[in-house]
Amino acid sequence: MICHNQQSSQPPTIKTCPGETNCYKKRWRDHRGTIIERGCGCPSVKKGVGIYCCKTNKCNR
């Protein structure tokens, strides 16, 4: 699986994730504004954090 792994407004970067079948994009707000985190897998999240998990290469743009 190949997933995007940059945070928020950083330039796009990708990561190869051997053995993974998902990519994710998490979104939440704090004192800095809206934070977006991307990576491999499909982690569980705390209340108030949005999560999008997908199953194709680079699907978490």
UniProtKB/Swiss-Prot annotation:
List the InterPro entries hit by this protein, alphabetically.
Answer: Snake_3FTx, Snake_toxin-like_sf, Snake_toxin_con_site, Toxin_cobra-type
Q: In which tissues is it expressed?
A: Expressed by the venom gland.
Q: Subcellular localization, per the record?
A: Secreted
The GO terms this record gives for MF are: acetylcholine receptor inhibitor activity; ion channel regulator activity; toxin activity
Q: Which UniProt keywords apply?
A: Acetylcholine receptor inhibiting toxin, Disulfide bond, Ion channel impairing toxin, Neurotoxin, Postsynaptic neurotoxin, Secreted, Toxin
Q: Which GO terms describe its cellular component?
A: extracellular region
Q: List the disulfide bonds.
A: C3-C23, C17-C40, C42-C53, C54-C59
- Claim: Disulfide bond is one of the keywords in the record: yes
The protein's predominant localisation is secreted
* Similarity remark: Belongs to the three-finger toxin family. Short-chain subfamily. Type I alpha-neurotoxin sub-subfamily.
In UniProt terms, what function does this protein have?
Answer: Binds to muscle nicotinic acetylcholine receptor (nAChR) and inhibit acetylcholine from binding to the receptor, thereby impairing neuromuscular transmission.
The name under which this protein is listed is Short neurotoxin 2
> What is the native source organism of this protein?
Naja annulifera
Give the taxonomic lineage as stored in the record: Eukaryota, Metazoa, Chordata, Craniata, Vertebrata
